[in-house]
Swiss-Prot record:
CDD domains from the UniProt entry: GDH
NCBIfam families reported in the protein's UniProt record: PRK13243.1
Native organism taxonomy: Archaea, Thermoproteota, Thermoprotei, Desulfurococcales, Desulfurococcaceae
Protein name: Glyoxylate reductase
Species the sequence originates in: Aeropyrum pernix (strain ATCC 700893 / DSM 11879 / JCM 9820 / NBRC 100138 / K1)
Subunit architecture: Homodimer.
Family listed: Belongs to the D-isomer specific 2-hydroxyacid dehydrogenase family. GyaR subfamily.
Top-rank taxon, per record: Archaea
Chief localization: cytoplasm
Annotated positions binding NADP(+): M159, G160, R161, I162, S181, R182, S183, T240, G241, R242, H290, A291, A292
Database matches in PROSITE patterns: D_2_HYDROXYACID_DH_1 (PS00065), D_2_HYDROXYACID_DH_2 (PS00670), D_2_HYDROXYACID_DH_3 (PS00671)
This enzyme's EC code(s): 1.1.1.26
């Protein structure tokens, strides 16, 4: 029996490829940049399975032109780059890698919070680029003043796995925790003393606003001009969720006009971020290249989970992290 063919859209950990090779003929796109759409389309036409990343556009046009394709295994929690509804209609399974990046993303969120609150990147540049040397100030009582976190209010927008872990760390810093989410989290309220707020009140009260929402039609540009104007002038906005949750133009205006004090961003509406983008001009903005999950431990777990989803499918089993559960009614798993 001919083995199914999987196209892996980027170099991943060899352990994952080794596992895949036991069940699939594996082809890997070995360039650092993602495959161009036309290349991806060409590969999909010949593939039984795709191993994808958020940077790959898996739209209905591509799915419709891939007659052999049975499963798309995404190495990410999010899957807004995939037309899941179309995939389900065509009997194509879609999987993701939930849960494994909670710790890494929460830790990185706190790295951003601390960097923005204590002006760490500014301080590094101040020393590295010679400004401290030129000023000959030594220690100065008014130099690089930031803000303490103890006693401040941490607002969590999206109290899922990551948001709740960020809140837990915030509690250890002695912060007051408030949150807005689709549903009340009674257990977290009890454990952390967290208080539920409407979105408007969350924005008004937060000293640090940390965003942990998936991107949907409802959350796209959820934070725009009117929302940013509700925030404190001393507030810091942190986004490790999805870039398009925040209207970038509105955020630039808010920073330029002083509606908020600072921002720390790991995700953007357009990635990679153009080095000439207005956001890069602000000293009070910390920028990172969508790196919140970038620890060796987490990325290996993600790579293996995506591979394990593909292996389960090849064995005729429903993959453990199936996104579109209703697809089972359209087609049974396996090749």
């Amino acid at each position: 029996m001919k083995r199914p063919r999987v196209f892996v859209t980027r170099e991943v950990f060899p352990e994952a490829l080794e596992l895949l090779s036991k069940y699939y003929d594996v082809e890997v796109w070995d360039k650092y940049q993602p495959p161009p759409y036309e290349t991806l389309l060409s590969k999909a036409r010949e593939a039984d399975a795709l191993y994808t990343l958020l940077t790959d556009r898996i739209d209905c046009d591509l799915l419709s032109q891939a007659p052999r394709l049975r499963i798309v295994a995404q190495m990410a929690v999010g899957f807004d780059n995939i037309d899941v509804e179309c995939a389900t209609r065509l009997g194509i399974y879609v999987t993701n890698t939930p849960g494994v990046l909670t710790e890494a993303t929460a830790e990185f969120t706190w790295a951003l919070i601390l960097a923005a609150a204590r002006r760490v990147v500014e301080a590094d540049h101040f020393v590295r680029w010679g400004e401290w040397w030129r000023l000959r100030t030594g220690w100065h009582p008014m130099m690089m003043l930031g803000v303490e976190l103890r006693g401040k209010t941490l607002g969590i927008l999206g109290m899922g796995r990551i948001g709740s872990r960020v809140a837990e760390i915030g509690k250890a810093f002695g912060m007051r925790i408030i949150y807005h989410s689709r549903s009340r989290k009674r257990e977290i309220e009890k454990e952390l003393g967290a208080e539920y707020r409407s979105l408007e009140d969350l924005l008004r009260e937060s000293d640090i606003l940390s965003i942990h929402l998936p991107l949907t039609d409802e959350t796209r540009h959820l934070i725009g001009e009117s929302e940013l104007k509700l925030m404190k002038k001393t507030a810091i906005l942190v986004n490790t969720g999805r870039g398009a949750i925040v209207d970038t133009g509105a955020l630039v205006k808010a920073l330029r006009e002083g509606w908020i004090a600072a921002a720390a961003l790991d995700v953007f509406e357009e990635e990679p971020l153009n080095p000439n983008h207005p956001l890069t001009a602000f000293k009070n903005v910390v920028l990172a290249p969508h790196a919140a999950s970038a620890t060796r431990e987490t990325r290996l777990r993600m790579a293996m989970m995506a591979a394990e989803n593909l292996v389960a499918f090849a064995q005729g089993k429903v993959p453990p992290n199936l996104v579109n559960r209703e697809v089972v009614k359209v087609r049974q798993p396996g090749f």
